[in-house]
């Protein structure tokens, strides 16, 4: 049967299984779902699947039985022709995205806090609580070593239960922006407090700056566990 574009969009939203679908109908189904804002993945192995594979957001061709035309039109080639591999790939991709977001949420307030410490000291005309060499050491050694832990973080238990993330959604939600600002402000206040206390306690400038470095490192470690 021939359907209009509006009818095809309604059918695509309400029907789960289609059988004996022609190449033209496959292409129409993909376009109908995309019009409704869906991210469409299409699997295929034959020449007749090429248009729909090309149109879909993620075209997946079979590696063993797939034709060269289908492989050229696809974005991904499924080497073992096992559909369970697609689920495993989605799961791994969500895990990578989660860990990347955790790292961003962790490293942004740390870097912003260090910048606020330096800027506040410059504008206030006081001694710099942490030297440029110490900042370099924190960023190159401490941050890299601690940040590597997020790369090997295990996936969340509900990772495949969650609904798909909207492509238009920001990487860092607005709620986390306020959290980043709060942690940065706490870090800046803690650094200045310990720096001032060390100097008033009769410690040298080197000891006071070392104290600030330790404060930054301990805040990084504590906040890292919080981000997990």
Name these PLM-found stretches.
Residues 53:
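Basic, alpha-helical nucleic-acid-binding regions used in initiation and control of genome expression
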Residues 1-42, 56, 61-228:
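Membrane-embedded transport module
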């Amino acid at each position: 049967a021939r359907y209009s574009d509006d009818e095809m969009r309604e059918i695509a939203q309400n029907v789960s299984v289609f059988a004996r679908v022609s190449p033209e109908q496959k292409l129409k189904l993909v376009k109908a779902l995309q019009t409704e804002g869906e991210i469409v993945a299409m699997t295929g192995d034959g020449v007749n699947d090429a248009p729909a594979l090309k149109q879909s957001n993620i075209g997946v061709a079979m590696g063993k039985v797939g034709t060269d035309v289908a492989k050229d039109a696809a974005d991904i080639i499924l080497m073992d022709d096992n559909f369970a591999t697609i689920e495993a790939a989605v799961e791994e991709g969500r895990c990578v995205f989660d860990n990347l977001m955790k790292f961003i949420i962790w490293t942004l307030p740390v870097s912003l806090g260090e910048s606020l410490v330096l800027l506040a000291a410059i504008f206030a005309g006081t001694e710099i609580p942490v030297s440029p060499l110490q900042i370099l050491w924190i960023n190159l050694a401490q941050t890299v070593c601690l940040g590597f832990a997020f790369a090997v973080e295990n996936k969340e238990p509900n990772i495949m239960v969650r609904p798909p993330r909207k492509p238009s959604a920001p990487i860092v939600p607005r709620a986390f922006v306020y959290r980043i600002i709060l942690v940065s402000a706490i870090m800046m206040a803690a650094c200045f407090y310990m720096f001032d206390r060390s100097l008033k306690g009769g410690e040298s400038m080197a000891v006071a700056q070392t104290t600030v470095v330790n404060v930054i490192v301990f805040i990084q470690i504590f906040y890292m566990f919080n981000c997990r």
